[in-house]
Structures are given as structure tokens and as C-alpha cells.
Amino acid sequence: MARQIKKSGARKTKRNAVNGITHIKSTFNNTIVTITNLKGETLSWSSSGASGFKGAKKGTPFAAQTAAEKAARQAMDQGMRQTEVLVNGPGAGRETAIRALQAAGLEITLIKDITPVPHNGCRPPKKRRV
């Protein structure tokens, strides 16, 4: 019988990045927080869904706050202290996620809104009738 050889796959390496960029994508249904170094390599990420929220609760500001805290904790364990924040999307959790990053202990050096705005491109979804 042949011996099993263990393959050493890609392991998570601890990166020491003091500065980084936090990308917050806030849609109506979910909020995704990704923290990268200055090159754009992901250090940590979290989302409302990954934080345990399901369905309509994923779009709430509290879910965004929980996701931001979780991502910030992981990034700070890898040595991050300062971050720039790039906010994208029209969702409810935008400001709450930024406040949660500050409360977690990250120093925010820049806040930039990079939400794409059409110059009258595609037709938007129809309005809801409740």
C-alpha cells in the first residue's frame, strides 16, 4: 500500500500591514466589509450574512456594524492601525460600518464615496408598491 503524502497547501500567512484600505460595499440587501493592504491584497473580510444574519436582517445598520467590527478585529490582529475607507453603494449600513471601525480602534485617515452614478444609463428598477 502506498503511503499518503500530505500536500502543504496555501496557508494563511500573517502579514504585518500598519496602513490599509477598507472597502465597504453597502447594498439594500447586504453589507460587505473588506480590509486590504495598500497593494490591494485582502487581509480580512466579513459580511452581514457571514456574521449570522439571514434574509431581510442582512440589510440593517446593526448587521453592518457587526460585520465591520468582525473584519476590523481580524485586521488589527495582523497589525493594522490606520485605514482609508472607500464606501460604495446606497445601503443602510454605510455610516454605521464606519463608526464601528472607529470604535474598534482603527484610525481612519480618509473617507471617500466611490458609488458609481450613471449619466442616465440603464433604466432603474421599478418602484415598490406596498
From Swiss-Prot:
GO terms for cellular component: chloroplast; ribonucleoprotein complex; ribosome. Keywords: Chloroplast, Plastid, Ribonucleoprotein, Ribosomal protein, RNA-binding, rRNA-binding. Disulfide bonds: none annotated. Pfam families: Ribosomal_S11 (PF00411). GO terms for molecular function: rRNA binding; structural constituent of ribosome. One of its GO terms (biological process) is translation. It is found in: Plastid, Chloroplast. The keyword rRNA-binding applies. It comes from the Eukaryota. The keyword Thylakoid does not apply. InterPro entries: Ribosomal_uS11, Ribosomal_uS11_bac-type, Ribosomal_uS11_CS, Ribosomal_uS11_sf. Belongs to the universal ribosomal protein uS11 family. Part of the 30S ribosomal subunit. This is Small ribosomal subunit protein uS11c. It comes from Pyropia yezoensis. The gene is rps11.
